[in-house]
């Protein structure tokens, strides 16, 4: 494949149509498990086949940032708990029941399958996102990632 061939490729040629998705009713815990098991950093949120949003590690990290561990004081090898552990436990339990729909980003940058790879790469760079859902009329068709685009360039050393 030469450089001209890459420029002619469309998002639909390289998108991953089998990328894992989440439903808005699933929990944050479900999302974390999916990310870990699938080695991904984000997933489209789909409701009745339509793209409803996207949830990323950043959404989950910022959500959990509100929960602060009370901490410990270590004095001469002895540990003294600080703060209110009951309050911490209650906040952690509340977080465990939070749904993906509550933390997802609803305004999603998307491309269509006929979009150029340059268009997808521009969205990724300007909006600082790693995953761009590929959609047609709100119907999710797949995703294209930074790695998909970078891999094409690495596998095509002729520039």
Question: Which stretches of residues belong to each language-model region?
Answer:
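Tandem CBS (Cystathionine beta-synthase) repeat/Bateman regulatory domains
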Residues: 1-159
């Amino acid at each position: 494949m030469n450089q001209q061939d890459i420029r002619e490729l469309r998002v639909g040629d390289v998108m991953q149509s089998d990328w894992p998705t989440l439903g808005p009713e699933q929990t944050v815990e479900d999302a974390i498990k999916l990310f870990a098991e699938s080695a991904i950093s984000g997933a489209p949120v789909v409701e009745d086949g339509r793209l409803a949003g996207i949830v990323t590690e950043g959404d989950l990290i910022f959500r959990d940032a509100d929960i602060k561990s009370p901490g410990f004081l270590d004095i001469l090898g002895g540990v003294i708990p600080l703060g209110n552990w009951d309050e911490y436990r209650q906040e952690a339990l509340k977080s465990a029941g939070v749904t993906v729909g509550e933390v997802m980003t609803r305004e999603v940058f998307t491309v269509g399958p006929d979009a150029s790879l340059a268009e997808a790469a521009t969205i990724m760079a300007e909006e600082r996102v790693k995953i761009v859902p590929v959609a047609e009329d709100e119907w999710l068709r797949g995703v294209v990632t930074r790695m998909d685009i970078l891999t094409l360039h690495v596998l095509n050393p002729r520039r």
